[in-house]
């Protein structure tokens, strides 16, 4: 692994830290560098620029960083922002590579075995491989990850060993190179060389590195000697640059170590013998027969291919780990001195806590009924204590941190002042009687002022009825529900910003991507009802949706003031008073956030009706593959022309198509 410590994180931005950012950056950096704090919390109000603060902290601490986000969409958003701020450093993306995942399970009550069923996303697998490869090779790396980070990954030593290097003037037969690539799970394809594939035409070999689709390698042979190595454009085949040496990791994140495979198989056989014997002692003949047949079938696959379906269930033996030993994860690719940032920690920490028990409960049933060896229990995510032990620098970031993060941390830093001077919105409580008529009147005022509105409700029925009512009143309204695909959601929010809609109604308006500056009013129905969506933390998050506009206001419809409402209102007033005082002291006039509306893709060739496309091609996987190939070429061309929004849009279309392949 790379041990060079001359890391330099170079933050590029036209902005300088302002508002509360300078004091927050200084305080947190000092806490880690001088005070040697292990855990800190950044309490950042919505719109105060928490991501920019994180970027400045990374630059000041100058160490590898892992940023955890609680879902793929938020992770993608952070990845995009960090990539823009650190163009000369390595910013990577590490999330679950499954578009669809149904884990293996057994339901004893109905005697139903559910086979693992999944749809992998090749592009995300490539990005995950790129993240591990960068951590092995470089120190100036930021990885943005989802909860996938706590799940088992290839051991760093194995990943490092499963690489091949080729040098100019090296004497090696072309067949030997092919053999080595196949051993690393590269596939020969002389027609379409994408990542993880290679082609051979005469004395020319083209390789799509497993970790990127931005370029391919071309190796020219003269007899058994490598005459030239070049990095080439995958589409045009033009030479980007000539190289003296290349290093290729495996085509997949997880590869069995062939050097230790014999020992691994012996361990599997020994455990099988013991498990089979135990089932027979208990007179569990069906389970005994089942574990014998299933495991022997997997052993034969290992012998022939070095691989088997469900290979991850044998990870303890393949990695020669002891029973109960902590599995290897992406955390093990970081050096001792690195930073962990847990973004939206109020959501992320509970998610991490719950993963271990959920996984173990399912696998214990599989083991009990002979579907898996007991060692399958060691193919697992980290438990919470293991997660906490992985680094001595943890920063929890949230507008509403939980009590656990507060108690765990040695220092709490508030970031309340916004660089724009915007203050938290005014909150008004109104009775529920005649609330629908009142909402209609409020929306008429908003429309007259050319400002937008969010309405959050508690039930699907109310959301649908209110949407229908407002449409009948000729109000341009959209309902943001959880069945919408990412692209459709993106379009609705874009259309709200452009005025195609005046109001958006939703149940969970806490999700990422709802920072819309044009929204000056948020209406909260059933504000006094108990439940997660009306807790004090949730209410503060909802209130924050109106904090991007100078005219921000929140109306709560309620007949009583609950404890949660009272806490949220008092905290908002506290922050608002601090912000107003700061503005007076520094003579700052608040300004609505100016945020460019994303590229209008409806006028672009890339604007494709996904449902229609899938419907047309659902009987032909080949047709979808051809369409994906064409779109991938468009995506690469758009990225090359720096049309990043269009490229991202096409990427989302590709992901939707591949997820729906039969």
Curated annotation (Swiss-Prot):
Keyword Oxidoreductase (UniProt): no
Entries under SMART domains matching the protein: DEXDc, HELICc
InterPro entries, A to Z: Helicase/UvrB_N, Helicase_ATP-bd, Helicase_C-like, P-loop_NTPase, UVR_dom, UVR_dom_sf, UvrB, UvrB_inter
CDD domains linked to this entry: DEXHc_UvrB, SF2_C_UvrB
Gene3D superfamilies (UniProt xref): P-loop containing nucleotide triphosphate hydrolases, UVR domain
Motif residue range(s): Beta-hairpin: 97-120
Entry-linked Pfam families: Helicase_C, ResIII, UVR, UvrB, UvrB_inter
Subcellular location: Cytoplasm
Domain Helicase ATP-binding span(s) in chain numbering: 31-419
Signal peptide: none
Source organism, top-level taxon: Bacteria
Any Gene Ontology biological process: SOS response
GO cellular component, one term: cytoplasm
Keywords carried by this UniProt record: ATP-binding, Cytoplasm, DNA damage, DNA excision, DNA repair, Excision nuclease, Nucleotide-binding, SOS response
Segments forming domain Helicase C-terminal: 438-597
PROSITE patterns, A to Z: HELICASE_ATP_BIND_1 (PS51192), HELICASE_CTER (PS51194), UVR (PS50151)
Residues reported in the UniProt entry to bind ATP: 44-51
Record GO terms (molecular function): ATP binding; ATP hydrolysis activity; DNA binding; excinuclease ABC activity
Domain UVR stretches: 625-660
The record's note on its domains: The beta-hairpin motif is involved in DNA binding.
Function: The UvrABC repair system catalyzes the recognition and processing of DNA lesions. A damage recognition complex composed of 2 UvrA and 2 UvrB subunits scans DNA for abnormalities. Upon binding of the UvrA(2)B(2) complex to a putative damaged site, the DNA wraps around one UvrB monomer. DNA wrap is dependent on ATP binding by UvrB and probably causes local melting of the DNA helix, facilitating insertion of UvrB beta-hairpin between the DNA strands. Then UvrB probes one DNA strand for the presence of a lesion.
Family: Belongs to the UvrB family.
UniProt-listed PANTHER family: UVRABC SYSTEM PROTEIN B (PTHR24029:SF0)
Subunit text: Forms a heterotetramer with UvrA during the search for lesions. Interacts with UvrC in an incision complex.
The protein's name in its UniProt record: UvrABC system protein B
Source organism: Malacoplasma penetrans (strain HF-2) (Mycoplasma penetrans)
Gene it is expressed from: uvrB
